[in-house]
């Protein structure tokens, strides 16, 4: 009887099957010139522009976490070829370089901020975070100092309560979405994230949890040396149509 009730609850809570996913892209630092070598966590502004141009020219539409959550729960239809664009780790270049490129193609993104870096050299300031939010982008939480939440002995007030409050004060808006540092999660972390009022959480490439799909949404790290064409093929490979 308990198993039947659980199945009914899952059907009501998640109208989409766990295996049906929307592409979610994950970026980190952005640079100009020859200051860095492109890699899994670094991409040049020119290459980012090329990738976004390929998405736009091939009919992709950026969506927000609110739209994704409503779709998962069966409350909303998504536009053709939806994609979510996310940036981790609070780099100042998210504002100075990524935001203008996003605007060029009419895209919106999610910026997952670790609050220990706010205002430090090379990282987003409070004013920049507010400006991104005011432009229609979503500000999400990425803990206080990027501590992996599956490691045990976590100070949840420091890693969840305070960062959420800080970001909500800066933006004047609810902070409803979370990204796990290093993509690492366990059920204890999920329970804490839910208890702190987050509506969904994003990991990296590990398998989604069948019990908690909304709190283990997969993302693909986009390599800095991928061409636009390569990005399109990787999207189809990682998030195949169902």
Predicted regions and their residues:
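Alpha-helical scaffold elements lining the catalytic groove of polysaccharide deacetylases
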Residues: 95, 124-138, 144-174, 184-195, ...
């Amino acid at each position: 009887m308990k198993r039947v009730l659980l199945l009914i609850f899952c059907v009501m809570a998640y109208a989409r099957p766990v295996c049906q996913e929307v592409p979610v892209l994950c970026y980190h630092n952005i640079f100009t010139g020859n200051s860095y070598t492109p890699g899994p966590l670094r991409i040049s502004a020119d290459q980012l522009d090329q990738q976004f141009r390929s998405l736009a020219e091939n009919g992709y539409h950026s969506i927000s976490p609110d739209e994704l959550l409503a779709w998962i729960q069966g409350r909303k239809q998504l536009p053709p070829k939806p994609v979510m664009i996310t940036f981790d780790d609070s780099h100042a270049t998210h504002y100075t370089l990524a935001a203008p490129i996003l605007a060029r193609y009419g895209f919106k993104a999610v910026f997952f901020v670790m609050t220990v870096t706010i205002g430090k050299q090379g990282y987003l300031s409070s004013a920049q975070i507010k400006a991104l939010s005011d432009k229609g982008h979503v500000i999400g939480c990425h803990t206080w100092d990027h501590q992996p939440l599956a490691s045990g002995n976590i100070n949840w007030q420091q890693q969840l309560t305070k960062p959420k409050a800080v970001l909500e004060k800066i933006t004047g808006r609810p902070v409803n979405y979370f990204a796990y540092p290093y993509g690492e999660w366990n059920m204890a972390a999920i329970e804490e994230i839910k208890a702190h009022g987050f509506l969904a959480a994003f990991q990296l490439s590990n398998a989604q949890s069948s019990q908690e799909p909304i709190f283990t949404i997969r993302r693909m790290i986009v390599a800095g040396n991928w061409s636009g064409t390569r990005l399109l093929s990787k999207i189809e490979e990682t998030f195949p149509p169902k």
